[in-house]
């Protein structure tokens, strides 16, 4: 049974699944779909077009699906799409996409967005991400599965954060961060691989050893990036993890953070 507090404002055209709960003074707009089991606390605002999956927890004063902060936006019906099992804490803002971009902002499954995080237009987030308080993404940013952003980390538009990467507190990121790499600093620089995170996720010693070798090849041998890529292909072709790093290099548009 759907439970809507009498002081909530839910547009009759909104579609809410079974066991959705909406707290007092929350506002749900007309072109919003919320799947079963999602809990929405008090004073949240969800505008559309927005699609939200199952079993999410959306806390007070979150603002989801508002128009993008983009001067070229002319009211096009772009979307925000949120998957299943996410936790979205107080004052988080997630904006819809733009017609000039992907037309949607997409957030995957089982992510944890702490208070005051900002997800701008046309971003694409994977699964099992952790964003600490006030981490912010500019437009068109991609973040791979299991990545972590520390509090107050800022990511420049069109950057990519690879799977299992770790971006420390207050990092300013203006280039692509490869998979498995740890970066930090006001103008972020690399500091090795995310060994703690990899161990926590069950990576074997052999996998971590190969990733460390790849990191040293990219960052510690003074090679041009093209030469480092070639060395990875020759020396570590057996490693699917390293191949993922090579693919990331090949698809980089802004260049790697080095």
UniProtKB/Swiss-Prot annotation:
The intrachain disulfides are none
- Enzyme class, first EC level, given as a word: transferase
The keyword Lipid metabolism is annotated on this UniProt entry: yes
Primary location group: cytoplasm
Per UniProt, the keywords (alphabetical) are: Acyltransferase, Cytoplasm, Lipid A biosynthesis, Lipid biosynthesis, Lipid metabolism, Repeat, Transferase
Q: What is its EC number?
A: 2.3.1.129
Pathway listed = Glycolipid biosynthesis; lipid IV(A) biosynthesis; lipid IV(A) from (3R)-3-hydroxytetradecanoyl-[acyl-carrier-protein] and UDP-N-acetyl-alpha-D-glucosamine: step 1/6
Give the Gene Ontology MF terms in alphabetical order: acyl-[acyl-carrier-protein]-UDP-N-acetylglucosamine O-acyltransferase activity
Question: What reaction gets catalysed by this protein?
Answer: a (3R)-hydroxyacyl-[ACP] + UDP-N-acetyl-alpha-D-glucosamine = a UDP-3-O-[(3R)-3-hydroxyacyl]-N-acetyl-alpha-D-glucosamine + holo-[ACP]
Q: Which InterPro entries match?
A: Acetyltransf_C, Acetyltransf_C_sf, Lipid_A_LpxA, Trimer_LpxA-like_sf
Function, as annotated, reads:
Involved in the biosynthesis of lipid A, a phosphorylated glycolipid that anchors the lipopolysaccharide to the outer membrane of the cell.
Concerning HAMAP family, the annotation shows:
LpxA
| Record-given protein name | Acyl-[acyl-carrier-protein]--UDP-N-acetylglucosamine O-acyltransferase
What is the organism field in this record?
Answer: Halorhodospira halophila (strain DSM 244 / SL1)
Q: Which gene encodes it?
A: lpxA
């Amino acid at each position: 049974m759907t439970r809507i507090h009498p002081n909530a404002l839910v547009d009759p055209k909104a579609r809410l699944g079974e066991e959705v709960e909406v707290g007092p003074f929350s506002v749900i707009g007309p072109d919003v779909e919320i799947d079963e089991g999602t809990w929405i606390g008090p004073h949240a605002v969800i505008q559309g077009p927005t699609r939200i999956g199952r079993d999410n927890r959306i806390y007070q004063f979150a603002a989801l699906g508002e128009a993008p902060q983009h001067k070229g936006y002319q009211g096009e019906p772009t979307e925000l799409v949120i998957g299943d099992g996410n936790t979205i804490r107080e004052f988080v803002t997630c904006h819809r996409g733009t017609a000039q971009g992907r037309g949607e902002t997409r957030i995957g499954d089982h992510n944890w967005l702490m208070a005051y995080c900002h997800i701008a237009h046309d971003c694409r987030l994977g699964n099992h991400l952790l964003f600490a308080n006030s981490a912010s993404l500019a437009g068109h940013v991609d973040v791979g599965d299991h990545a972590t952003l520390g509090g107050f980390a800022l990511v420049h538009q069109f950057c990519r954060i690879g799977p299992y990467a770790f971006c420390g507190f207050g990092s300013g990121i203006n280039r692509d961060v490869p998979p498995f790499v740890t970066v930090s600093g006001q103008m972020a620089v690399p500091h090795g691989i995310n060994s703690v995170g990899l161990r926590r996720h069950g990576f074997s010693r052999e996998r971590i050893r190969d990733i460390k070798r790849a990191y040293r090849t990219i960052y510690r041998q003074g090679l041009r990036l093209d030469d480092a890529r070639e060395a990875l292909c020759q020396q570590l072709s057996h490693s699917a993890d390293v191949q993922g790093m090579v693919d990331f290099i090949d698809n980089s548009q802004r260049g790697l953070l080095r």
